[in-house]
């Protein structure tokens, strides 16, 4: 056998041109395992000389690592180590790929070389006893000197059963039908002794994994969470007691306090209640402080520091000393704010001093009206007094007690009963005492048009309408003669503009229409549509201006002709979608 390895070169192992296709690129580096040689020799019962002549192609299997390969003797080993051309190339991509003998980290050539120092050679020699090998005639392998010296004894390993996978559990689509749940305690119904069931099941299935789990759990200290399992069902609690009593003789079950301190795993069949064991107290240690309350004293701070944080978080009943969190503002604070506002309002001497700045039109007009209240009546100058700094007059307090609208209505009724007819539109009017009182011209008092023959000597304040511009108010006639003169000389310009299409009189702006007359205008909406489409209905009762979408529908219906009596001619155009009359489109 030794002469076989010495005299046979590397190229003799190939059996023709087909041997390269059946072997991988590293077959020249590794020799077949000794078990394959012994099995082939014992099965064929041929001699060593016949083995030299038989050159059949060999298929080497590198997937099994249980049997160690036998290295070549010194001559062949030196030939392998001496020739650099026989070494494997840097990249195997240029060689033919064989999926059967693919490289893995476990079956690489480097791994097989390193495994020689860890596997004993006593067992493989027993397989080669038929070839005349013995422990004394074992050749000396030079590659062992180059490897690290490790003990050649291997401890026999007992095959361990791996834990079954959870893929066999049919969790979806119906979690209620769990046929395999009894085999896996971690997916079964939650009980008080789920931890013991899981640990014992791991111990019976795989003892080494159970030892690892036990070592890891020994360093873990569960959090002390009291009163977490108080609301459990009595059935599950009794069931846990029975199982602990039955297994106490065989296993060392932990105490009940350790179960109470650990959180229970949520079951698949029963969803976890997210609102369970929540407290009504605040999560902050110190209670919130509102302005009516006093800040926490030293006694309350000592009480909060001595109290356990975990007890305050998970207690079902709040103690009497703790203040319950209330998000609503206290009534005492509301009354205090009202009182402070009343004191602040009474302390101001002027009535408009406490009025805040506002952009409201009504509020500004009321403020101006109250500031000029001395000219609202004929005898107001002698009766109205300026309020003192410390005390407000009785009349001013009565005015502020009523609303603004009631104040204006009362002033209007009083003025109609006491007003006198004026024959001239002079700015000054005589009073009963014969004295002339000059009317102060105020730019903030707008003038409204009153067609009544009698005009009061003060302006009626319009609360709901904005003030007119000075240009428009100057055009309006104040007296009877002025109105007659204006009506006799020129027509009134107070004509209401109406849209010629939709007959609307309210529009933010007016746009030109198809009519050459300037009075015929369109509102903003109709003007924008006519600017885009340039189409209008010729029916005087309709005059609808279509939109762009309506124009497309009208175009799909086709062009039609119709005689229009107003124009005394036949017009060609589209049909109106609203009245089915002919329309006119003006080209730009």
UniProtKB/Swiss-Prot annotation:
Keywords annotated in UniProt: Chromatin regulator, DNA-binding, Metal-binding, Nucleus, Phosphoprotein, Repressor, Transcription, Transcription regulation, Zinc, Zinc-finger
Biased composition (Polar residues): 99-109
Protein name: Transcriptional regulatory protein ASH1
Biased composition range(s): Low complexity: 417-433, 470-493
General remark: The ASH1 mRNA is transported to the daughter cell before cytokinesis where translation produces the protein to block mating-type switching. The ASH1 mRNA 3'-UTR and the mRNA localization machinery that are essential to restrict accumulation to the bud.
Record PTM Phosphoserine, positions in chain: 56, 465
Source organism: Saccharomyces cerevisiae (strain ATCC 204508 / S288c) (Baker's yeast)
Subcellular localization, as worded in the UniProt entry: Nucleus
Matching InterPro entries: Znf_GATA, Znf_NHR/GATA
Major localization listed first in the record, in broad terms: nucleus
Function recorded in the entry: Component of the RPD3C(L) histone deacetylase complex (HDAC). Responsible for the deacetylation of lysine residues on the N-terminal part of the core histones (H2A, H2B, H3 and H4). Histone deacetylation gives a tag for epigenetic repression and plays an important role in transcriptional regulation, cell cycle progression and developmental events. ASH1 is necessary to repress HO in daughter cells to block mating-type switching through its binding to HO promoter 5'-YTGAT-3' sites. Also involved in pseudohyphal growth.
Oligomer status and interactors: Component of the RPD3C(L) complex composed of at least ASH1, CTI6, DEP1, PHO23, RPD3, RXT2, RXT3, SAP30, SDS3, SIN3, UME1 and UME6.
Annotated stretches, region: Disordered: 85-109, 377-398, 417-495
Zn-finger segments (GATA-type): 499-526
GO molecular function, one term: zinc ion binding
UniProt record, GO biological process: chromatin organization; negative regulation of mating type switching; negative regulation of transcription by RNA polymerase II; positive regulation of pseudohyphal growth by positive regulation of transcription from RNA polymerase II promoter
GO cellular component: cellular bud; nucleus; Rpd3L complex; Rpd3L-Expanded complex
Biased composition (Basic residues): 383-392
SUPFAM superfamilies per the UniProt record, alphabetical: Glucocorticoid receptor-like (DNA-binding domain) (SSF57716)
Coiled coil regions in record: none
């Amino acid at each position: 056998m030794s002469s076989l390895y010495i005299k046979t070169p590397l190229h003799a192992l190939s059996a023709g041109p087909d041997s390269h296709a059946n072997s991988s690129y590293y077959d020249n580096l590794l020799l077949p395992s000794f078990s394959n040689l012994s099995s082939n020799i014992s099965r064929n019962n041929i001699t060593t000389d016949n083995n030299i002549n038989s050159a059949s192609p060999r298929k080497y299997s590198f997937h099994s690592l249980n049997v160690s390969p036998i290295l070549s003797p010194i001559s062949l080993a030196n030939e392998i180590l001496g020739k650099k051309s026989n070494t494997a190339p840097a990249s195997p991509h240029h060689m033919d790929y064989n999926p059967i003998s693919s490289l893995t980290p476990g079956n690489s050539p480097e791994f097989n070389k390193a495994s020689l120092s860890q596997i004993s050679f006593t067992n493989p020699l027993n397989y080669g006893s038929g070839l005349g090998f013995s422990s004394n005639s074992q050749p000396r392998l030079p590659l062992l000197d180059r490897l690290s010296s490790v003990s050649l004894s291997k401890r026999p390993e007992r095959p361990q059963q791996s834990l079954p996978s959870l893929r066999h559990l049919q969790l979806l689509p119906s979690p209620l039908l769990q046929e395999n749940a009894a085999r896996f305690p971690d997916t079964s119904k939650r009980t008080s002794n789920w931890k013991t069931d899981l640990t014992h099941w791991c111990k019976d299935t795989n003892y080494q994994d159970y030892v690892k789990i036990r070592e890891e759990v020994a360093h873990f200290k569960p959090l002390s969470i009291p009163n977490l399992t108080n609301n459990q069902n009595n059935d599950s609690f009794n069931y846990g007691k029975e199982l602990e009593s039955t297994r106490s003789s065989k296993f060392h079950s932990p105490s009940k306090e350790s179960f109470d301190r650990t959180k229970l795993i949520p079951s698949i069949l029963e969803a976890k209640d997210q609102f369970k064991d929540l407290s009504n107290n605040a999560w902050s240690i110190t209670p919130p402080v509102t302005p009516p309350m006093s800040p926490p004293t030293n006694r309350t701070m000592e009480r909060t520091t001595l109290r356990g944080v975990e007890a305050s978080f998970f207690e079902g009943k709040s103690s009497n000393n703790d203040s319950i969190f209330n998000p609503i503002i206290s009534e005492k604070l509301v009354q205090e704010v009202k009182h402070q506002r009343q004191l602040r309002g009474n302390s101001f001497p002027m009535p408009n001093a406490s009025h805040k700045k506002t952009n409201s039109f009504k509020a500004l007009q009321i403020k101006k009206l109250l500031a000029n209240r001395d000219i609202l009546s004929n005898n107001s100058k002698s009766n109205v007094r300026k309020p003192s700094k410390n005390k407000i007059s009785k009349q001013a307090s009565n005015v502020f007690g009523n609303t603004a609208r009631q104040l204006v209505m009362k002033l209007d009724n009083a003025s109609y009963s006491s007003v006198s007819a004026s024959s001239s539109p002079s700015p000054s009017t005589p009073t009963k005492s014969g004295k002339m009182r000059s009317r102060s011209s105020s730019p903030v008092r707008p003038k409204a048009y009153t067609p009544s023959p009698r005009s009061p000597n003060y302006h009626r304040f319009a609360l709901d309408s904005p003030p007119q511009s000075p240009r428009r108010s100057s055009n309006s006639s104040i007296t009877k003669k002025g109105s007659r003169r204006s009506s006799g000389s020129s027509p009134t310009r107070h004509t209401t503009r109406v849209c010629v299409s939709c007959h609307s009189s309210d529009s933010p702006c007016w746009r030109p229409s198809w009519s050459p007359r300037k009075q015929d205008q369109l509102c903003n909406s109709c003007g924008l549509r006519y600017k885009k489409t340039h189409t209008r209905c010729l029916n005087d009762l309709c005059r609808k201006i279509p939109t762009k979408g309506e124009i497309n529908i009208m175009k799909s219906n086709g062009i039609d002709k119709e005689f229009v009596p107003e124009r005394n001619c036949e017009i060609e155009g589209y049909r109106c979608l609203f009245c089915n009359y002919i329309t006119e489109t003006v080209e730009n």
